[in-house]
Amino acid sequence: MKIERIEVSAVAPPTEQFQWSEDLPAQYATNTLLRIFTEDGVEGVSGVWNATSYGFEKYTAEAIRHIAPILIGRDPLQREELFFDIRPRVFPVPPQALAAIDIALWDLAGNVAGMPLYEMLGGARDKIRSYASTPMLPDVDAYLKFVEELLAEGYTAVKFHTWCIPEKDLELSRAVAKEFDTSKIDFMLDAENNYERGDSLRVAREIEDLGFTWFEAPLPDYDLDGYRELTR
């Protein structure tokens, strides 16, 4: 079995754009769709999503176009070998481009095996719990109203994108914990990598006491020492 062709598209919906933190403009959401076809007619599909500040992005799709020739004529089931050959070398490769290829190759492997990918990997569940994720809203009352709407739709977990200002975020966290029963709905806070270490620890301790389920991305992703400090 060999890869015969690859198709990649960047698509963007004409929807309202949202802010995720006070220091960011409204974000443009772009989906990059990838399809890998074999000469036997088997197909693997994937999609990755990016947010950018000043326009829709094409760099993920363009990066895949540069990588695609390496994959043509190769065995799609040899994922580790393929990944070694497409690793970043002469020019940087966006992680999203590598992720799209990886997901499509796994999807293709599931189609070859004739079973859903989760089943091929040993999964025993036929459904998973979902959570809703908010944009940044203007004030606490707007968040409380939004949570009410999400509960009416059947959600039992909500992740907050907020102003990413510790005191304002704590004000919201206290308000939702007071207004709603945290034994029946889970809350999570996403700080979008905006906090300093001291603020991260302070906020983490308080929202833990408030019954929040998790605290996402308080520090820059590569601040490994900071995350070690937070998790001691």
Residue ranges, per PLM feature:
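Metal- or metallocofactor-binding catalytic centers and their adjacent structured scaffolds
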Residues: R5, F37-V112
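Glycine-rich, aromatic-flanked loop segments that form ligand/cofactor-binding clefts
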Residues: V93-Q96, D102-L137
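Structured beta-strand/loop patches that form or line metal/cofactor-binding pockets in enzymes
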Residues: M1-V45, W49-S53
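Active-site mouth loops of central-metabolism enzymes
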Residues: K127-A142, H161-T162, A191-R197
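Non-catalytic positions within long, well-ordered alpha-helices that form the structural scaffold/packing
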Residues: E148-L151, E208
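Catalytic core of soluble alpha/beta enzymes
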Residues: F160-W163, E167-R232
